[in-house]
Amino acid sequence: MRLKNGCNIKTIHKVPTLEEALLAAKGKIMINLDKADRYFDQVYELLQKTGTTEQIIMKGSKPAKEVKARFGKYLDEVIYMPIVNLDKEDAKRQIDVFVEDMRPAAFELLFVKDSNPLPRMLADSLKGESLIWYNTLWDTMAGGHDDDMSLANPDEGYGYLIDVLGCRIIQTDRPAYLLDYLRKRGLHD
């Protein structure tokens, strides 16, 4: 299997195995294993083999009780980050339970529109408890403050998430652009 370029043409670059990717990243970066919860027993064996358990962020949208039952034996070694859809009726309660039971390092928060008051409230209530992570890949994940908005007006995109919603982690498809913006604002070395 080969990687494709922006024109959907196969390149000479081979798609690495998870083990190869873990070894390449070892000691350099945090690794977001999105959707790995379904296979985490097998993934964990690779993490131990490669010595990368402390670099892993495992995310999921299951309730705290289920996370503790299913992944409890791993939670001292890997970072578990809950994904909470703030447009759901029980979102605030889910967050409160996670903070009380698991004290997560961060939450990935999702919401479709700025009319939802919860993102602003959480900027204050999670301060000092957990970091806030927003995903800017699509306009439906961070109230429209996505990568595309940020290209046109970075203060309305990334800046809004940082300044108004207390975001400290941004998942983006435009890392160089985001880093440039953060450096211009004195928020990154």
Regions found by a protein language model. Give the residues of each.
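C-terminal active-site rim and adjoining tail of enzyme catalytic domains
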Residues: 10-11, 83, 88-189
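Metal-dependent phosphodiesterase/phospholipase catalytic core, i.e.
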Residues: 1-88, 101-105, 109-112, 128, ...
